[in-house]
From Swiss-Prot:
The keyword DNA damage does not apply. Testis. Residues 1-61 are annotated as: Disordered. Belongs to the protamine P1 family. GO terms for biological process: chromosome condensation; sperm DNA condensation. The gene is PRM1. The keyword Hydrolase does not apply. This is Sperm protamine P1. Protamines substitute for histones in the chromatin of sperm during the haploid phase of spermatogenesis. They compact sperm DNA into a highly condensed, stable and inactive complex. Coiled coil: none annotated. Keywords: Chromosome, Developmental protein, Differentiation, DNA condensation, DNA-binding, Nucleosome core, Nucleus, Spermatogenesis. It comes from Aepyprymnus rufescens (Rufous rat-kangaroo). One of its GO terms (molecular function) is DNA binding. One of its GO terms (cellular component) is nucleus.
């Protein structure tokens, strides 16, 4: 039982750490991308620039 408990906590902490790291990377990339690309293609995005493609890419990260 002790062994099971330990393995469980270990996997949980690992998942949590990975999740946090992922979100951090995502936020950083989003900010960098937005600041650089927003000014250039603002009109294009508003019109509906490849919404499907963007959502797909966003879901992946």
């Amino acid at each position: 039982m002790a062994r099971y408990r330990h393995s469980r906590s270990r996997s949980r902490s690992r998942y949590r750490r990975r999740r946090r790291r992922r979100s951090r990377y995502r936020s950083r990339r989003r900010r960098y991308r937005g600041s650089r690309r927003r000014r250039r293609s603002r009109r294009r995005r508003r019109r509906g620039y490849s919404r499907r493609r963007y959502s797909r890419r966003r879901r992946r990260y």
